[in-house]
């Protein structure tokens, strides 16, 4: 297999672990190549040019080479423009990273999801200036993640008829299928949503309090279906704190 070289690829660091005495193994989310495993040689050395750059939640341009699954980072440049995450916003950032690591296979490109992630991190980094709360910021990302990875069906069409939901009618989200009108014998744990909420969620509009509440129920259900018994540490903390 020929060695591959990639230059100046937009990326975010999701996670890093020490490797040998002076290096790091990075899990990075890139725009055109998806999740990549990169070794940053010498990044732990006190005077390494990489050390101050390889920070989570900061937009980077990274370059790498190699032909194995673990490529070698050859350059990393901080793009800038985003304040550091603090407080609840920092917890939410770790939550997003946990989701990406659990949901995304390596080296599958998700350009739209990358853009959504970048937008979400930017909104979290400017939380004090945002008119939206944490849940309004997080819900669109969760939905994008589920739909881009194939774990959520369309919300603006009924699975059996392909009709649009009726505003005041009630619907359930049936696992493995999608949205359909509610029935009396439906399991009680399936999410119940108004047609109005389904259409708003599909359009990315979470401004209505009832829609936001119903979207929370739906996202927890769909994420839980995929994660099953896996507990994401930051996600559980945010749930316990009633932040998401």
Swiss-Prot record:
Signal peptide: none
GO terms for biological process, alphabetical: DNA recombination; double-strand break repair
Keyword DNA damage included in the entry's annotation: yes
GO CC annotation terms, alphabetical: bacterial nucleoid
PANTHER family: DNA REPAIR PROTEIN RECO (PTHR33991:SF1)
Function: Involved in DNA repair and RecF pathway recombination.
Protein's recorded name: DNA repair protein RecO
